[in-house]
Amino acid sequence: MSESSLQNEVAKRRTFAIISHPDAGKTTITEKVLLHGQQIQKAGTIKGKKSGQHAKSDWMQMEQERGISVTTSVMQFPYHNALVNLLDTPGHEDFSEDTYRTLTAVDSCLMVIDGAKGVEDRTIKLMEVTRLRDTPIITFMNKLDRDIRDPLELLDEVEDVLKIMCAPITWPIGSGKNFKGVYHLLKDETILYKTGQGHRIQEETIIKGLDNPELDEKLGVWADELREQIELVNGASNPFDKELFLAGELTPVFFGTALGNFGVDHMLDGLVDWAPKPQGRETDQQEGVSATSEDFSGFIFKIQANMDPRHRDRVAFMRIVSGKYEKGMKMRQVRTGKDVRISDALTFLAGDRSHVEEAYPGDIIGLHNHGTIQIGDTFTAGEDFKFSGIPNFAPELFRRIRLKDPLKQKQLLKGLVQLSEEGAVQVFRPLISNDLIVGAVGVLQFDVVVHRLRTEYKVDAMYENINVATARWVSSKDEKKLDEFRRRAEANLALDGGDNLTYIAPTMVNLSLAEERYPDIEFTHTREH
């Protein structure tokens, strides 16, 4: 393949994920983004569970029962001259580590905020993860078709709580029943809102300039209000600066309503124009890998079981970092040193699979996995390096897991280790007992695990509460000190699914004391795969 055609393929791609608090409208915005990409002719409405019209991006059986997106699915669609990869992230009350890890596989993020509620705690957590790589953030203030908080107050809150500068690109005219549309600060034009157009792309009425008499004609008293507001906004807010945006220090802000399908295209225009094309990545060698390098490489950031209820298969999601994937090509799995031929990679539109003939940097492909691929695995054209920056995150919730039938201990352990390799949950085996402790980032992961143990491994398990506040991976440069620590702190130590030594703390105070008592031991809350 010529270098210039590889560069062209890279230049037109944008790979991003959506971060939000549950119910801020992420699934609806995903629908509308796909509608603009012409993937779904009529956006699948996210309504009551009984309507039978399930959102296009919510799939496994459990999600369809509950109306939540538990798994990270991948959607690719064309928009203007770009090819956009959208990684959907589990967004409900609780998502899992998958959500965190997905953020390490994208080049930019769209942050969706409920205009009535402002910045919520899940959003704060997810923003912390994007900070690990200074990922550029675009913001969409949603639900303008309802009454929202004062827009300037919302911007202040984002700046204050998330420590990122805001540059408004569009500005709302009214909200709720009085929502009239938005003014585009960079284009100097007003775009009017029509209700009842949520399921299709609307013909927009655009009025150029703030002094245009047509504005008074169409908006009445709101026209003068808008002029005053824009004067205030121009004086009080940051102008858009692409370099600051790319450095993760400033976020362009768009206002709209995903449900009413208004403003989503303004945001997509910004994403395609400003968000970075696929970026290279750091490795464990001196040299990183550039996206335009001709040699193929990629890494696994997620493994999903049972996308196909008829087959007990698992699919490993790979982000391509460099080179070109071609059907039937050989690639090296660096961890095992084996060369594998991949002839049946997949692309997805949430649950609809299609086989890929070729794919490029920034694309996500699915590899069939019969238990041989793990999260964090690097695949190359033959070189031996490993991509860094695909972390495990310390769980925040813990349960002891018990069997209803004690004879199935072996199947339980097998199931839990496989589920932990997929990132569905983390498993800890205390050094001094036969307990099995399961750790998760969100409560829902526990339900998912019991459900999957029952349906995929025929194991009936239940949980008991356990007195664990947090876990930290432990290591030391001094082997003797580590051995001594292992002897003295044995009651609090466990091995995780990958046999890494872990400190299980009953309270945060206990953890602080342990860190003070053992200064030569490093306690970390993320661990590289």
From Swiss-Prot:
Example GO biological process: regulation of translational termination
Residues given in the record as GTP binding sites: 20-27, 88-92, 142-145
Location within or outside the cell: Cytoplasm
Protein family per UniProt: Belongs to the TRAFAC class translation factor GTPase superfamily. Classic translation factor GTPase family. PrfC subfamily.
Primary localization class, coarse: cytoplasm
Organism of derivation: Idiomarina loihiensis (strain ATCC BAA-735 / DSM 15497 / L2-TR)
Gene (name only): prfC
GO MF annotations, alphabetized: GTP binding; GTPase activity; guanosine tetraphosphate binding; translation release factor activity, codon nonspecific; translation release factor activity, codon specific
Statement: the UniProt record of this protein carries the keyword RNA-binding: no
GO CC term, one of those recorded: cytosol
Keyword Nucleotide-binding: yes
Keywords, sorted A to Z: Cytoplasm, GTP-binding, Nucleotide-binding, Protein biosynthesis
Taxonomic lineage of the native organism: Bacteria, Pseudomonadati, Pseudomonadota, Gammaproteobacteria, Alteromonadales
Role summary: Increases the formation of ribosomal termination complexes and stimulates activities of RF-1 and RF-2. It binds guanine nucleotides and has strong preference for UGA stop codons. It may interact directly with the ribosome. The stimulation of RF-1 and RF-2 is significantly reduced by GTP and GDP, but not by GMP.
InterPro entries reported in the protein's UniProt record: EF-G-like_DII, EFG_III/V, G_TR_CS, P-loop_NTPase, PrfC, RF3_C, RF3_dom_3_sf, RF3_GTP-bd
Gene3D superfamilies: P-loop containing nucleotide triphosphate hydrolases, Peptide chain release factor 3, domain III
Ranges in coiled-coil conformation: none
Name the UniProt record assigns to this protein: Peptide chain release factor 3
Domain tr-type G positions: 11-279
